[in-house]
Amino acid sequence: MTKSNGHNATMIVTGACDFSSSFSLASSSSSTVSVTTFNISSLSSNPNIINSSSTLFRSLSFSLIRHRSSYSRRSLRRLSIHTVHGNKTQFFSHSSTRTPPLFTANSTAQRSGTFVEHLTGITESEEGISEANGFGDVESARNDIRNVATRRIETEFEVRELEELPEEWRRSKLAWLCKEVPTHKAVTLVRLLNAQKKWVRQEDATYISVHCMRIRENETGFRVYRWMTQQNWYRFDFGLTTKLAEYLGKERKFTKCREVFDDVLNQGRVPSESTFHILVVAYLSSLSVEGCLEEACSVYNRMIQLGGYKPRLSLHNSLFRALVSKQGGILNDQLKQAEFIFHNVVTTGLEVQKDIYSGLIWLHSCQDEVDIGRINSLREEMKKAGFQESKEVVVSLLRAYAKEGGVEEVERTWLELLDLDCGIPSQAFVYKIEAYSKVGDFAKAMEIFREMEKHIGGATMSGYHKIIEVLCKVQQVELVETLMKEFEESGKKPLLPSFIEIAKMYFDLGLHEKLEMAFVQCLEKCQPSQPIYNIYLDSLTKIGNLEKAGDVFNEMKNNGTINVSARSCNSLLKGYLDCGKQVQAERIYDLMRMKKYEIEPPLMEKLDYILSLKKKEVKKRPFSMKLSKDQREVLVGLLLGGLQIESDKEKKSHMIKFEFRENSQAHLVLKQNIHDQFREWLHPLSNFQEDIIPFEFYSVPHSYFGFYAEHYWPKGQPEIPKLIHRWLSPHSLAYWYMYSGVKTSSGDIILRLKGSLEGVEKVVKALQAKSMECRVKKKGKVFWIGLQGTNSALFWKLIEPHVLENLKEHLKPASESLDNVKEAEEQSINFKSNSDHSDDCVNSEAHFY
């Protein structure tokens, strides 16, 4: 029923229906409403939607929205997608009778393996480029948003004109709020709304939020919505949350979109298909932000398993391309997700494009344990679909067969690659070298390496690494030395992996003098690394040069970038015990007890005898679990920088999640140091070899971390403790800076922080107590504390003794600032982008933009 007389313009839509066409009615306020006609015949032909309830959420120039929902467990609710053109709001809806099953990853998607780097040297053909753009364009997925089928519809919805409100004062105040709210920042906006608490109702706040969305002030609309949810009169509004989430998602505000999305889930409701679709696209549009791909996969999986939806082909393809394009990775998660996407495309009857087959074969070939059967199955399906195998597929096959050591299959695949007449990528030569190394034919491997040099005009870095590794295993000393010299002269980097292989070979052959020369050359041309130090230390202890071994050990211990490990301690301890140096052995033993390193069983027997003479008891087990002072200070800095704590409230235990960024130079160095410092606290599965420490590992679950969980992660969210000023030592500040700080191009220092505004103020005051002035801005949920000029120099002077040696040059502020440390001039910090906070929200010393 619709009335357009300007005094009682109310529209109520009920029932579940198939929207087939629409017409427009103009109200007296000159706003145009798009009203949808119903295809009644579809109800009888489609019994699945007879019990469905429906919702239409309309956005008018001045329209008040009231949402009444009636819930039925068996009914499907969907909000129709709409777009705004000028003064007209159009709604698009496509009926659908299909009921998709809940899918889980099939058995073929659960194979183990690791995801490795992309093929190098492969250039796409024009055909390949066009195909890649066709199957993986995020823009195509974004364009499909408006065409997403809507199968969850609310029961009843009412749209009223602003003029229909009986109280004139309410109309005036609402109009005034609609004008004022978009002009204010977050804190002032909340104060403004709080001042209206006495008269504002949910319908009023909903109207303001929708008005903000209509004028494209979506973040302001979100703030009004968030304020509304904190009021005691608030009732969940599915229509409003759906509209808000989709508007935020279309602007790529994935964090706020996810908050609203989670609000729907927390109410026991299933978001609409369009909301799922938009949120996935928002994440895929921000892949440069860490963790967005994982979140996109999580939402995609929920879309299918929880919502029972069948996504558009463009969404499948976009997510698949993002998985294939991801650099690096751990375990076989990417393969499982890719198999799940492939399974969904096939079972829903969508077209499987050529690049999907190619990408899936490529992912399988990257695994440590290759499933040749699955690869052959995909090849058969690819042929049935009428696709020819491209160069990328053939190279993937070459890699897979090389890992299995199948020389015959490699040669046959090599001929196929030659027949394609599209050039041989350098990585194909590396795979062929690996295949022959598996069968011990190093002469053939060397021949292939020389062919690569002729074919591409010089060997690649990966080619040098592979051939040197192969020849070191068969101990071809002269040939290895010749190749290493060529490698150094070529100027290619990194050299460290090859130096480590050569050092191992020299140690096995007993060529300790050559090993020492290789060690010295490595330090001159590469950054210091614990693996090469450990090999050199083993060599010194084996030849009995314990004095020099002690010096090298002390150098490792004093350099936080290298640090000592259980292996280096056991190596030196064995040397001291074999030579009868009991005093030095006791010192190493005490160090191992302090660091809680395990002592090798043969050494325990010797220690037991030596210490029994002095009536000392050998501690078979480490001390009771307790963090040292240094560990506590490091943990405070890391927690401020974003370290996460996962809690099990039932068992009252907590687990630290150590996570590092692969694309951060500071994190590459820092993860080694953190792994060594917290080794005794790490989960047994996290005790990896020194040279393959992952970018993510966990501590053991322990009640000792309860203090940190209570103060830094209450209720599973980051928070800043009230007593942070007591715990903010220079050591903690240094690790905070190394973990999440940034040095700008101008040499200023910016620190990243999550928590409440009050907590940030406490941190700012703590810095001011150390004579450092700072400015703060907020972006999303993250605060950025900036120190510029003299302030950055003072900060650096405070933390420099605790910064890892290899990071000092990388993190050191501008030299001009250091020259002016003694000047007391106050520096002003200007973050160019505006924040969500106004200047009046904090004290006068630390300004929030």
UniProtKB/Swiss-Prot annotation:
Instruction: From the Swiss-Prot or TrEMBL record, state where the protein is found.
Output: Plastid, Chloroplast
| Entry's Gene Ontology molecular function annotations | endonuclease activity
Q: What happens when the gene is disrupted?
A: Can grow only in vitro on sucrose-containing medium under low light conditions. Mutant plants show a pale-green phenotype, very slow growth and delayed development.
Transit peptide: where?
1-68
Which cellular component appears as one GO term in the record? Answer: chloroplast
- Top-level taxonomic group: Eukaryota
Query: Start-end of the PPR repeats?
Result: 237-271, 272-310, 312-352, 355-389, 390-424, 425-455, 460-494, 495-525, 529-563, 565-599
Keyword annotations: Chloroplast, mRNA processing, mRNA splicing, Plastid, Repeat, Transit peptide
Q: Which family does it belong to?
A: Belongs to the PPR family. P subfamily.
> What is this protein's function per UniProt?
Promotes the splicing of group II introns in chloroplasts. Required for the splicing of intron 2 of plastid ycf3 transcripts, a factor required for the assembly of photosystem I (PSI). Involved in the splicing of several other group-IIa introns. May be involved in the splicing of precursor forms of trnL, trnG, trnI, and trnA. Required for the assembly of PSI and PSII.
PANTHER family, sorted: PENTATRICOPEPTIDE REPEAT-CONTAINING PROTEIN OTP51, CHLOROPLASTIC (PTHR47539:SF1)
For this entry, the protein name equals Pentatricopeptide repeat-containing protein At2g15820, chloroplastic
